[in-house]
C-alpha cells in the first residue's frame, strides 16, 4: 500500500537492488506497481552474486561479480523479477576500483543498452568509507548517467567532493540516506533505542548515535515551526546541490511519506543557513562546545 501511496503523492522514481531480499525487493515493485510501469522510473542494482548457494557468514559482504556473462545473467533475472522488458537505470552496486577499470563491464552495459534491456547505466557507490577513488574515477573516466552516493547534513564526505565533478561531467547524483540513519527525523529525540538484530544500526557501537545526536542539536536552527521539520530540512539540504537530481529517503509509514514528499513545499535552505552548516561541518559540529558558535555573516 505504501508504494501505491507514494505514486499518489507524486513519487515516480523507485530504487531497489537484486540483493535486497534476494530479489524480493524487485518482485514487490512488480506486484504493486506493475500496472503503472509506463508512469514510473525503475532503478535497480547488480554485482553481488545472490545466486551462490553458499551460506553467508552473518552480515559479511557477498562475493561480487562483474564479468560479462554474470552481468547479462543478472540483468535477465532482474527483468524477470520486475516483470518488465526494460530497466530505466541499471547500477553497479558498491563497485570497487579494479572492476571500474575493466572496459569489458562497460562494453557489456552498452550492449544491454543497445538491446533495449536497459535505458541508462550508472554506479551506486558505498558504503561511505573508502570510495573516494571509485567516485572520482567514475565521474571523470566513465560515461555513466548517474552515481548514487551517501550524502546528508551529517555525512558529507566523500560525496561533497563529487558534487563539482558531477556537474563538470554532466553526471546526475542520487543521494541516499539523507536522514543519516534516521538521526535527522526525530526518531531518537526521546533517547537511545534498542535496534533489532537484523537492523544494520545494531552492529554499531552506541557512541555513534550519542555523537550524532549532539550534532543534531547543533542544527536545530533549521527547524521552522509549522513550516519546515528537521526531516524536511535534511531533504532541502541535499537538494540545494544542483548536481543532485534525486534524493532517496526511506519511509515506513504514510505519515513519513507525506512529510518527506511535502519537503519541496517548505522554505529552501537559505544562504545564511548554508553558511552556518558549512562552518559547523568544518568544525566537527562543535560537539565539545555547550552551544554552537557562528561567525557573523
What are these language model-derived features?
Residues 14, 87, 121:
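Glycine-centered flexible beta-alpha turn that most often forms the glycine-rich phosphate-binding loop
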Residues 1-6, 66-82, 128-137:
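Short, acidic/polar
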Residues 1-44:
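N-terminal binding-site loop/beta-alpha segment at the start of enzyme catalytic domains
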Residues 57-70, 94-98:
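Active-site mouth loops of central-metabolism enzymes
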Residues 96-280, 284-286, 294-297:
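Beta/alpha (TIM)-barrel catalytic core signal, keyed to glycine-rich beta->alpha loops juxtaposed to Asp/Glu
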Residues 43-62, 89-91:
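N-terminal small/glycine-rich loop or linker at the start of catalytic domains
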Residues 79-98:
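Active-site groove signature of glycoside hydrolases
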Residues 8, 31-41, 79-83, 107-113, ...:
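Acidic (Asp/Glu)-rich catalytic clusters
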Amino acid at each position: 500500500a505504501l508504494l501505491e501511496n507514494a505514486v499518489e503523492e507524486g513519487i515516480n522514481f523507485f530504487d531497489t537492488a537484486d540483493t535486497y531480499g534476494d530479489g524480493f525487493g524487485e518482485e514487490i515493485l512488480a506486484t504493486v506497481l506493475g500496472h503503472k510501469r509506463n508512469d514510473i522510473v525503475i532503478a535497480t542494482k547488480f554485482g553481488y552474486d545472490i545466486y551462490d548457494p553458499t551460506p553467508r557468514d552473518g552480515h559479511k559482504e557477498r562475493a561480487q561479480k562483474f564479468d560479462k556473462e554474470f552481468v547479462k545473467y543478472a540483468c535477465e533475472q532482474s527483468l524477470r523479477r520486475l516483470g518488465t522488458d526494460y530497466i530505466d537505470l541499471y547500477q553497479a552496486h558498491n563497485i570497487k576500483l579494479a572492476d571500474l577499470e575493466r572496459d569489458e563491464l562497460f562494453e557489456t552495459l552498452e550492449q544491454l543498452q543497445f538491446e533495449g534491456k536497459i535505458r541508462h547505466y550508472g554506479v551506486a557507490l558505498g558504503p561511505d568509507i573508502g570510495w573516494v577513488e571509485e567516485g572520482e574515477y567514475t565521474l571523470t573516466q566513465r560515461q555513466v548517467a548517474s552515481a548514487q552516493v551517501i550524502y546528508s547534513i551529517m555525512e558529507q564526505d566523500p560525496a561533497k567532493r563529487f558534487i563539482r565533478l558531477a556537474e563538470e561531467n554532466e553526471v546526475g547524483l542520487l543521494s541516499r540516506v539523507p536522514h543519516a540513519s534516521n538521526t535527522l527525523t526525530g526518531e531518537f529525540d526521546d533517547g537511545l533505542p534498542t535496534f533489532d538484530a537484523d537492523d544494520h544500526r545494531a552492529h554499531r557501537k552506541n557512541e555513534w548515535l550519542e555523537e550524532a545526536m549532539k550534532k543534531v542539536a547543533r542544527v536545530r536552527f533549521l527547524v521552522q515551526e509549522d513550516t519546515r521539520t528537521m526531516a524536511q530540512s535534511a531533504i532541502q539540504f541535499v537538494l540545494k546541490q544542483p548536481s543532485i537530481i534525486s534524493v532517496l529517503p526511506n519511509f515506513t509509514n504514510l505519515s513519513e511519506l507525506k512529510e518527506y514528499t511535502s519537503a519541496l513545499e517548505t522554505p529552501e535552505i537559505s544562504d545564511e543557513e548554508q553558511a552556518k552548516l558549512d562552518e559547523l561541518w568544518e568544525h566537527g559540529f562543535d560537539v565539545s562546545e555547550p552551544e554552537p558558535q557562528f561567525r557573523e555573516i
